[in-house]
């Protein structure tokens, strides 16, 4: 393979000279592709120890990582990565590998013949084939896009291993770049000079300087960056600087793995300054202590939101992954910093900007904004990054604000956009995907492939003057045959049928998989056009438009605001998860909007079951759900809970409301009456505080001390006295006439 060896050597030499990466595509038969990869790596002067192969490992002599474990490579850098795309072309894996190649390195793709690739079905296509669809129903539009962009972009060499022909050498012949100026320690810095010495770019040094604002209270810092800019590292340098000054730094992130870079840099700085107090300063530990008495510690978001031990500084890494409710808790800290990824390989974070900025600006913190654009591992303008951003739509954005800022729902046109239409119109595709990226942190490259190729996925949108203002991603679910339903009921997993799966496996309703439904996976409205009714208009259009469907549904992390939105649009709650989401700390709710008799029957029985069981769950697995979430969930249940109180139980409730009887004598009837009111009663009968009291004390059974503290009663006696107040109007509204004489005895 002399032609390949020469091309690989030239490609690697240019990559090293420019501190950029280059991409080498080896197209053709798989075994020949692996041989070509080894030859190219050798010709490029890269040692085997500096290479990771991603795939099954067959035919290679490099360290191998399964394609399903590419998350283990995040945060590492390699001189070369060989990604085998024959068994599966997984978009997330592709994006992650782009981010893991160091400047001067090579990303090698071993792929089928380019003209055939899109027409082949692989393991990822099996993943997209959601039952009852099969892999033959999956399309190849995403791989068609990959092939087209590989052929169009600079810095990408293409070699046909079957014909042993070089189709493109991938060389760009760039002009030499001037050396960047040295990084200097700013005058008057509060941080150690060693922290600035550890910065790799001017952007990092500027961000570190901004983080010095956290030396005084009532300051906040927001750092936004594309992936690979070193924002987590600079947060770690700041954390270490505060810790060596004796301060307590609380770090939180979606997972500890996400925050490893923070702890690694903090550990390195403290070691350089000889300030580590013990062996807990290892980068894998969750607490780092310094000789000055300071520390850097990690807590998961739900625990961190309580600000345990009153930290001096809070650092929130990958903030866009967390809900606004959690961020609001962090604003109680005197000093807080948020870092967030704008264009990421496993999720993007403009939603943080959309959802939280107003609250941050209204807080008592002076906010310092920082944007980091300079890569730390390769040169700016790196052609492989440019290709990945375009091919995977990592930089997709909605229309610029002025184009939609005056739009109204009445002037919008409704469109059902097919995948072929999206592929044919790059502008429309970028705006559509950009809105999903902006509104949902976990929108990732796999979602682009799902949007283009999955047979159960469809898109609906509202457009104004040709620009996407609101978009919904829909997933067709259900319609499962008896054999599949039986398997799921007995414990088998099923892809892509979230609502039928929950109803069949968790709630033991085997028949729930038979009706056909459409789940609204995601709905997003342009930030400049929110709170005007676009989302409601879009849902109404979808309801009128879908055919052959028994129900519409949705599932999401429950908040009072979202619950009210979906309930206003006709969706009723039928299930609340019994565990919190580990990242967001929220409980997930499932809601249905029935469209046919079959859908009505499904909705009616699950709404009734939910209303019947939720009171018991509140005393157990749902005991720590926020009272306002409970109120909103129950208000969204379309059912009539049974009010089967005996005459003696009614006399107890009436006597506690109007006379000397005690709630503690038998809490059961009080709970059933509370459920009835919260599900089907007039919401104007009780104040929000009175309803919270019912939830906290009567349904969840918290101690009177906890209730008094949470609801701001002056003491436990006041809280217990207040418990009688909401039951008076409830007795008046629900008690049968033959027990009202009990009320009349006390001069009501």
Question: What residues fall within each predicted segment?
Answer:
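Hydrophobic positions on the alpha1 helix immediately C-terminal to the Walker A/P-loop
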Residues: 36, 234, 238, 538
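Inter-Walker segment of RecA-like/P-loop motor cores
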Residues: 57-79, 254-305
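Conserved RecA-like ASCE ATPase "motif II neighborhood" in helicase/translocase motors
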Residues: 62-96, 292-332
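Terminal substrate-recognition subdomain of acyl/acetyltransferases
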Residues: 267, 271-292, 302, 313, ...
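Conserved beta-hairpin
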Residues: 446, 456-474, 479
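N-terminal pre-P-loop "Q-motif" helix
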Residues: 2-11, 196-219, 689
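Conserved coupling/interface region of RecA-like P-loop/ASCE motor cores
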Residues: 133-202, 206, 358-401
